[in-house]
Amino acid sequence: VDHANYVVNEFLRMLSTGITRTQRDATYFAEQLHVSLKYLSRVVKRTTGETITSYIDRATIPILRKYLDEERLSLTQISDIMNFTSLSYFSRYCSKHLGMTPSKYRSSKV
């Protein structure tokens, strides 16, 4: 296996561990894999046809939905647990990836 395939496989393995619950910064993954962000971006895109961010988001969404489906945690608690920098960023992230704000997502599940 060449280095590029190894890096891509390790990146995907890292995502499968649930790490995106707290880590969604592409730079973090590059550092953990001891490669530059530019290299990681290039080999993931070349090997899979997708961006690093799309993989990170796809790994994050099920975790996010799970927390939102658990009524016992407030939106602030979920935002904190998942290391979002602010509640407003958390809300924007949900709107972008779930098509609605976290509170609307919750009320739609009732």
Per-range role (PLM):
Residues R92-V110:
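…primarily DNA-binding HTH/wHTH and HhH modules…
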Residues T27, K38, S74-Q77, L87-S88:
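Residues within helix-turn-helix
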Residues E10-D25, V44, T48, R65-S74, ...:
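Basic, amphipathic alpha-helical hairpins
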Residues L40, Y89-F90, C94:
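Short hydrophobic/aromatic patch on the recognition helix
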Residues V1-F11, G18-L33, R46-S54, R58:
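Short, Lys/Arg-enriched, Trp-marked, Pro/Gly-tolerant hinge/linker segments that flank
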Residues Q32, I81-M82, H97:
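Residues within the alpha-helical elements of helix-turn-helix
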